[in-house]
């Protein structure tokens, strides 16, 4: 079993890096404001036709454009969900959503979280899924990538105050990166058996004589960008464990690769754009080491199974509860780590049914900010925040002014870095405390004791870090939970983007200093270790008390 797990993880990473390297080259061209081959004339027509100014923006203008797009998208999607019953492509005549569920869902998809307090096939029309959620899957992914483009330019440019043009970046990312890749993946899903139609739900009688209603819909087109954009919200309530979304072992592997493809490619692009490929490779090494260790822990926990079941002489020691039998324990464990290391949240197994330690690892990966590959754009700018913190700590130890890629890191950058890193832990801990202190919060818990606390902690961690997965034993479709999680999602997304853009605005005007004998190398094994240690230190200091009350206490109670 250990050999199978090793081969599965190694083959996954090998294929990922082979696919991500060429994509990183294309992304680096866009970061450096170089049109992709054959696109320059099309872009000129687009800029004229859409009235887009090609003038570059400073960080405040860039941020304002990003916020404007997202707030407009939030308003449109909220109204669309409220009035769903008045819109076309609703063959099941589904009613509009309640105000709190519509608000939660709109914020969820605009922030790239895709938390779902509903079942897609019983709640949303085809129009809401296509024109509402799928559109936001593209725009939220493009937003994250645009922000990391601006931050990378801040490191590579000098003595100017502009970071590019947000509207041009958003159009290029959507047209030349997201749409072509999503189309290819969607066609593969359709060929493998995923649904793509606008038919009414189909009634049929099973071989047992039971009448059932099969949901239909444009699944493959949404599924592709759901994974590629690290969105994660399923067309169906069962998410990627549903055979209409994920019909085969091939599509399952493609889904996992799609989740990590752009985050890994952005690391390569960062190295190319900065002029030192070793910088991108350093980030990939740090991310990969944490990822592999987490996969090993989850696989080990799930293979050992539940001690309570083993006492009754179960046929297998594997923890198959909540697992899709088509994929098994090892693949389910790998998928769980992939989807929570990134800000995706799609699932092929119920994380609530994992062992205590097996479920703690996905929770912890979210809590450290999803910087292990992470979401499209957000994962890399989150990890770069930890890079700045690691450089600062190293500077304190050796008595030098910290610098990274030749840019001196001053008080302003460190204040913004600390603010961005502390936003999500504050939301998680205060949100969990609020839920546990109030009767309305506790009433949503369907399990007592440490596991019930873990469900609450997981939900708030997922929302604040824009993941969207859940321990399912929580009744979240209530005004309290919808509003609390909506607030966490909104602040967790834009409360980090704003200081990241402020850091970019501060760094871009600085001159790049040549390396000196006293400069800390940020591309070697020593710095990889320092970076991993910084991530672990922040995660440990912040969340160990909360984890001790939940999954750790539950694990100890099993023996």
Curated annotation (Swiss-Prot):
One Pfam entry name: KdpA
Transmembrane parts of this sequence: 5-25, 63-83, 132-152, 170-190, 250-270, 283-303, 329-349, 356-376, 379-399, 416-436, 484-504, 524-544
A GO MF label: P-type potassium transmembrane transporter activity
Annotated Gene Ontology cellular component terms: plasma membrane
Membrane-related topology note: Multi-pass membrane protein
Major site of localization recorded for this protein: membrane
Keyword Cell membrane among record annotations: yes
Domain of life: Bacteria
Subcellular location: Cell inner membrane
Record-linked InterPro entries: KdpA (IPR004623)
Keywords, in A-Z order: Cell inner membrane, Cell membrane, Ion transport, Membrane, Potassium, Potassium transport, Transmembrane, Transmembrane helix, Transport
PANTHER family, per the entry: POTASSIUM-TRANSPORTING ATPASE A CHAIN (PTHR30607), POTASSIUM-TRANSPORTING ATPASE POTASSIUM-BINDING SUBUNIT (PTHR30607:SF2)
Function: Part of the high-affinity ATP-driven potassium transport (or Kdp) system, which catalyzes the hydrolysis of ATP coupled with the electrogenic transport of potassium into the cytoplasm. This subunit binds the periplasmic potassium ions and delivers the ions to the membrane domain of KdpB through an intramembrane tunnel.
Subunit structure: The system is composed of three essential subunits: KdpA, KdpB and KdpC.
HAMAP family hit by this protein: KdpA (MF_00275)
Assigned protein family: Belongs to the KdpA family.
Designated name of the protein: Potassium-transporting ATPase potassium-binding subunit
Species annotation: Citrobacter koseri (strain ATCC BAA-895 / CDC 4225-83 / SGSC4696)
Gene: kdpA
């Amino acid at each position: 079993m250990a050999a199978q797990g090793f081969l599965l993880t190694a083959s996954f990473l090998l294929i990922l890096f082979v696919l991500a390297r060429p994509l990183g080259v294309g992304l680096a061209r866009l970061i450096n404001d170089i049109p992709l081959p054959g696109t320059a004339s099309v872009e000129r027509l687009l800029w004229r036709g859409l009235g887009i100014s090609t003038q570059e923006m400073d960080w405040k203008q860039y941020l304002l454009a990003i916020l404007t797009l997202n707030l407009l998208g939030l308003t449109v999607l909220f109204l669309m969900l409220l009035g769903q019953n008045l819109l076309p492509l609703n063959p099941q005549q589904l009613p509009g959503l309640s105000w709190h569920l519509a608000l939660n869902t709109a914020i969820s998809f605009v922030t790239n979280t895709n938390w779902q307090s509903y079942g897609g096939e019983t709640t949303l029309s085809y129009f809401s899924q296509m024109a509402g959620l799928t559109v936001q899957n593209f725009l939220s992914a493009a937003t994250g990538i645009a922000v990391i483009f601006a931050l990378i330019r801040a490191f590579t440019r000098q003595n100017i105050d502009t970071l590019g043009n947000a509207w041009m970046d958003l159009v290029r990312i959507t047209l030349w990166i997201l749409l072509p890749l999503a189309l290819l993946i969607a066609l593969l899903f359709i060929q493998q058996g995923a649904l793509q139609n606008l038919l009414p739900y189909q009634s049929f009688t099973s071989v047992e004589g039971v009448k059932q209603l099969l949901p239909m819909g444009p699944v493959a087109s949404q599924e592709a960008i759901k994974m590629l954009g690290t969105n994660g919200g399923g067309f169906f309530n069962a998410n990627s464990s549903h055979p209409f979304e994920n019909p085969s072992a091939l599509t399952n592997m493609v889904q996992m690769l799609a989740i990590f493809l752009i985050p890994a490619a952005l690391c390569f692009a960062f190295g190319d754009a900065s002029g030192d490929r070793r910088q991108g490779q350093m980030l990939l090494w740090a991310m990969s080491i944490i990822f592999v260790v987490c996969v090993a822990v989850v696989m080990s926990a799930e293979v050992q199974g539940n001690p309570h079941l083993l006492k009754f002489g179960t046929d297998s020691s594997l923890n198959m509860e909540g697992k899709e039998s088509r994929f098994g324990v090892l693949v389910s464990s790998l998928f769980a780590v992939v989807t929570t290391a990134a800000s995706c949240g799609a699932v092929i197994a119920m994380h609530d049914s994992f062992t205590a330690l097996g479920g703690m690892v996905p929770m912890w990966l979210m809590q450290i900010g999803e910087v292990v590959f992470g979401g499209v754009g957000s994962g890399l700018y989150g990890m770069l925040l930890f890079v700045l913190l690691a450089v600062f700590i190293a500077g304190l130890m050796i008595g030098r002014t910290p610098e990274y890629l030749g840019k001196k890191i001053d008080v302003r950058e460190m204040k913004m870095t600390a603010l961005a890193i502390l936003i999500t832990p504050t939301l998680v801990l205060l949100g969990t405390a609020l839920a546990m202190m109030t009767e309305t919060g506790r009433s949503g818990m369907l399990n007592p004791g440490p596991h019930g606390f873990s469900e609450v902690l997981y939900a708030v961690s997922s929302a604040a870090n824009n993941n969207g997965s859940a321990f399912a034993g929580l009744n979240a479709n209530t005004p309290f939970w919808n509003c609390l999680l909506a607030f966490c999602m909104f602040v967790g997304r834009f409360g980090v983007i704003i200081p990241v853009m402020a850091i970019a605005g501060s760094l871009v005007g600085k001159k790049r200093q040549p390396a000196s004998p006293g400069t800390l190398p940020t591309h070697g094994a020593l710095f990889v270790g320092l970076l991993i240690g910084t991530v672990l230190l922040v995660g440990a200091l912040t969340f160990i008390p909360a984890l001790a009350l939940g999954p750790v206490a539950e694990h100890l109670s099993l023996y």
